[in-house]
């Protein structure tokens, strides 16, 4: 089993690590630091010692304490001699014991006789002992003749004088023989039952055992010797010299209702089915307890020793409606702890599989060497970040990206003056915020690229904030200095407003004017980078286990899951066993950014590895471990934790949230299956699509993954109504296309992220309810009202504005207030029907269902126009 560290024991018990180290050293363990690991058995002993304050038996030999060892050894030797002699010559043993214990027996005989008298009196008055015997222990009384008194007293004295409480093997064998003889004698005896009364002249031997043991009817072959139950009340002694483990072959007698001395008094219990021991559970008041961050109500109640209903009622009194399966947040846990008067220690269950925390970096200075600096290039979209890196690498990466914008995180190695520099190129598009944050967190120096003709833009500000949050040095590269519209002073002024002050203005930030097109200032930029790296004194230990960051991951045909990494400490070699989040495996192959095979990747260098069990999440920390088993355990624990966390989301809502939940259920959703070429792009797309929503519509990503579109994706889409499959930088195969056509599933692929987002916006707009607006057609004044039999009222009007159309919607307005809305039922010009009447003409207007028209009212005509909604 895996060893347990001291700090883990301290965290579980809620103690400081120093206290645990002190307690461990009290047990004789040589613990020096909290990171020392011990075996699980030793950890359990430390735990027991701290909880009970009693030194475990296994550690007593390590502690030097004054003990009376000499008398114990003498007693043991004497006992062994007596047992051996008892086997060979029982009669000689009795005489020997009588001589050794002669003086002690005299005193003991008197005590035994007094006890015998008391027992006989108690036997005649069993009803007076009913209440007392419940709290006291019971035993056996062996009634024998006087000839065996000395032998009995010798045995009794041996038990009393012995420091060892447990019964030795020889005594157990003799007792077994005695009880087996008793069984045989019972078979020989007649069926009629007799009651026995102990004589005053008989001596006794009492054997007391724990209450859990049952005693059957016991008698010996000798007719003059009978075993009776001892119902005498004894003063309860302190359980200092009582052995917890008693012989299993002796059971406590369970008599029937007749009682001792009456007909049918004591019965034998079947030996085939021994009675189950009933453990008496004592409810202990919990004063302090360790609680995990994510705990359900019933789990919390179990931890603090309260009933679930009690906890739920307490929460109800605090204004929280919960069920037993609901999760408690930290605030609720602290409030409940205060209510119940319990001290809590909130722990994080994720620490159990935090392999990064368990990773110990070697700090031996003799093994530390200077490593390559890691530089991240950040800035606004289309400001020339990738073009600048292309000039440094003498390559053309930007031209190969769709739309001329970077949509992947790339890691590249460059040599300058015999020294290696690792560059990370991040996207500038607003959708790739997570990628920029990830790049800033694993870098040593950040280069912010700003176009001289464009100035500071939103993503420029965001990149600066990421760099400041990461606490890394910033170098400003003013690009496109070869353009006529270049204005570096404008850039410096804008950045100065953000507290990025140039060195020449008295600040601490280096500004370098460069041109990715002509190469101007590139050498100066690299010199400043190396100078800054020297100031930082970047060092790492290449001899330790490797620790790396995954900046991108994907699935490649024929290779499986691949990951782009930057090693931060140690050296990663081919064949190393690694774990990264839920992914683990053995490194089968490694290559650099140009595809050249590598055998090892040193600290500060980047590369691509193959061999992970699945696509690791971008941003995960990759650690090399000793064995495959250890890696698998870490990954499986993380997977199970994430799965349980996802499945056990709380369903409780407050009254304020209830309306929002109902409204959420009424939202229209666009089901989408999303596939991308790399993990980083998939993450950016998911974040962008989830933002495309309003009070009426949203995007529901039913499945997402890295890799090509498969037939299972088509099957899932066909099972979901009105769903579409979106692919980014991937193309479906012929079989998948045919399958999609048969199932009626639409597949859309893109290679530019904003094209995908624009199309999804258009789809969402089509699903939204159209925007209805009114268009005013005209207005007419009622100058006469005519009542026509069987038809109703007809208004004689003069059109004052626009036109009045037959069938148009109208409003009847009186004193500026709308009194009726309806449609034009009839429209006539003199006696002829008309489709419309223009301004300045008289007409007769009939309004459907309206019989309350008056002279001086106005009729307003309008029509409703529907417009397509957009997100």
Curated annotation (Swiss-Prot):
For this protein, the record's CDD domains field holds: IF2_eIF5B, IF2_mtIF2_II, mtIF2_IVc
Any one GO MF annotation of this record: GTPase activity
Q: Where is this region: G5?
A: 515-517
Annotated region (G4), positions in chain: 479-482
A Pfam family reported for this protein in Swiss-Prot or TrEMBL: IF2_N
Q: What is its main location?
A: cytoplasm
Positions of region (G2): 404-408
- Compartmental location: Cytoplasm
Entry function: One of the essential components for the initiation of protein synthesis. Protects formylmethionyl-tRNA from spontaneous hydrolysis and promotes its binding to the 30S ribosomal subunits. Also involved in the hydrolysis of GTP during the formation of the 70S ribosomal complex.
Family statement:
Belongs to the TRAFAC class translation factor GTPase superfamily. Classic translation factor GTPase family. IF-2 subfamily.
Q: What is this protein called?
A: Translation initiation factor IF-2
Q: Which organism's genome codes for this protein?
A: Campylobacter jejuni subsp. jejuni serotype O:6 (strain 81116 / NCTC 11828)
Q: What is the lineage of its organism?
A: Bacteria, Pseudomonadati, Campylobacterota, Epsilonproteobacteria, Campylobacterales
Q: Which gene encodes it?
A: infB
């Amino acid at each position: 089993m895996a060893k347990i560290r001291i700090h883990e024991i301290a965290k579980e018990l809620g103690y400081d690590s120093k206290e645990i180290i002190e307690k461990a050293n009290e047990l004789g363990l040589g613990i020096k630091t909290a990171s020392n690991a011990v075996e699980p058995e030793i950890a359990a002993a430390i735990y027991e010692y701290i909880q009970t304050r009693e030194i475990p038996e296994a550690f007593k030999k390590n502690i030097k304490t004054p003990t009376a060892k000499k008398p114990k050894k003498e007693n043991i030797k004497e006992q062994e001699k007596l047992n051996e002699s008892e086997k060979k010559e029982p009669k000689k043993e009795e005489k020997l014991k009588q001589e050794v214990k002669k003086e002690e027996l005299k005193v003991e005989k008197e005590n035994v006789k007094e006890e015998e008298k008391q027992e006989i009196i108690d036997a005649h008055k069993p009803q007076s002992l009913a209440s007392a015997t419940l709290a006291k222990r019971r035993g056996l009384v062996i009634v024998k003749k006087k000839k065996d008194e000395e032998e009995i007293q010798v045995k009794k004295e041996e038990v009393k004088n012995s420091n060892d409480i447990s019964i030795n093997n020889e005594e157990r064998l003799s007792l077994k023989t005695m009880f087996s003889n008793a069984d045989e004698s019972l078979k020989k005896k007649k069926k009629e039952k007799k009651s026995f009364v102990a004589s005053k002249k008989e001596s006794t031997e009492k054997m007391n055992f724990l209450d859990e043991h049952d005693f059957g009817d016991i008698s010996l072959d000798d007719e003059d010797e009978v075993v009776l139950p001892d119902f005498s009340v004894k003063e309860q002694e302190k359980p200092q010299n009582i052995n917890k483990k008693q012989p299993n072959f002796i059971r406590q007698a369970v008599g029937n209702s007749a009682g001792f001395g009456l007909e049918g008094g004591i019965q034998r219990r079947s030996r085939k089915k021994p009675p189950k021991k009933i453990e008496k559970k004592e409810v202990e008041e919990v004063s302090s307890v360790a609680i995990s961050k994510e705990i359900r109500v019933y789990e919390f109640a179990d931890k603090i020793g309260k009933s679930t209903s009690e906890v739920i009622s307490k929460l109800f009194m605090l204004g929280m409606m919960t069920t037993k399966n609901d999760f408690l947040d930290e605030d609720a846990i602290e409030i409940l702890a205060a209510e119940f008067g319990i001290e809590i220690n909130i722990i994080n269950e994720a620490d159990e599989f935090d392999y990064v925390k368990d990773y110990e970096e070697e700090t031996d200075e003799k093994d530390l060497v200077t490593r390559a600096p890691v530089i991240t290039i950040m800035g606004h979209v289309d400001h020339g970040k990738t073009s600048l890196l292309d000039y440094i690498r003498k390559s053309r990466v930007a031209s190969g990206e769709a739309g001329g914008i970077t949509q992947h995180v790339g890691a590249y190695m460059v040599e300058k003056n015999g020294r290696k520099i690792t560059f990370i190129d991040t996207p500038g598009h607003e959708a790739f915020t997570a990628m920029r944050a990830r790049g800033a967190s694993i870098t040593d120096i950040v280069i912010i690229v700003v176009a001289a003709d464009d100035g500071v833009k939103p993503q420029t500000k965001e990149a600066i904030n990421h760099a400041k949050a990461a606490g890394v040095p910033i170098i400003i590269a003013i690009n496109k200095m070869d353009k006529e519209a270049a204005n570096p002073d404008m850039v410096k002024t804008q950045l100065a407003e953000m507290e990025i002050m140039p060195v020449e203005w008295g600040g601490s930030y280096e500004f370098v004017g460069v041109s990715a097109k002509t190469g101007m200032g590139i050498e100066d930029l690299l010199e400043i980078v190396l100078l800054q790296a020297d100031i930082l004194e970047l060092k790492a230990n290449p001899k330790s286990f490797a620790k790396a960051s995954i900046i991108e991951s994907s699935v490649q045909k024929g290779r499986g899951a691949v990951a782009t990494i930057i090693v931060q400490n140690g050296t990663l070699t081919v064949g190393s066993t690694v774990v990264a989040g839920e992914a683990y495996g053995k490194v089968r192959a490694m290559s650099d950014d140009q595809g050249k095979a590598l055998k090892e990747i040193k600290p500060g260098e980047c590369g691509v590895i193959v061999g992970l069990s699945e696509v690791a999440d971008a941003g995960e920390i990759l650690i090399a471990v000793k064995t495959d088993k250890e890696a698998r355990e870490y990954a499986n624990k993380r997977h199970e934790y994430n799965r349980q966390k996802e499945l056990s989301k709380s369903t409780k809502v407050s009254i304020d949230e209830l309306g929002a939940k109902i409204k959420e259920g009424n939202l229209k959703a666009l089901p989408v299956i999303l596939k991308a070429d790399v993990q980083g792009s998939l993450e950016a797309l998911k974040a962008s699509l989830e933002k495309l929503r309003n009070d009426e519509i949203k995007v529901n990503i039913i499945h997402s993954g890295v890799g090509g579109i498969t037939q299972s994706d088509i099957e899932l889409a066909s099972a979901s109504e009105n769903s579409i499959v979106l692919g980014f930088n991937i193309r479906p195969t012929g079989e998948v296309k045919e399958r999609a056509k048969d199932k009626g599933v639409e597949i859309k692929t893109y290679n530019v992220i904003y094209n995908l987002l624009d199309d999804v916006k258009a789809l969402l707009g089509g699903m939204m309810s159209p925007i209805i607006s009114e268009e005013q057609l005209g207005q007419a004044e009622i100058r006469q009202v005519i009542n026509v039999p069987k038809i109703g009222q007809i208004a004689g009007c003069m059109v004052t504005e626009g036109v009045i159309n037959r069938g148009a919607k109208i409003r009847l307005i009186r004193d500026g207030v709308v009194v009726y809305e309806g449609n034009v039922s009839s429209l006539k010009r003199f006696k002829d029907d008309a489709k419309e009447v223009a301004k300045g003409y008289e007409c007769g207007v009939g309004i459907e269902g309206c019989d309350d028209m008056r002279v001086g009212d106005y009729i307003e005509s309008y029509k409703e126009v529907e417009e397509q909604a957009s997100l």
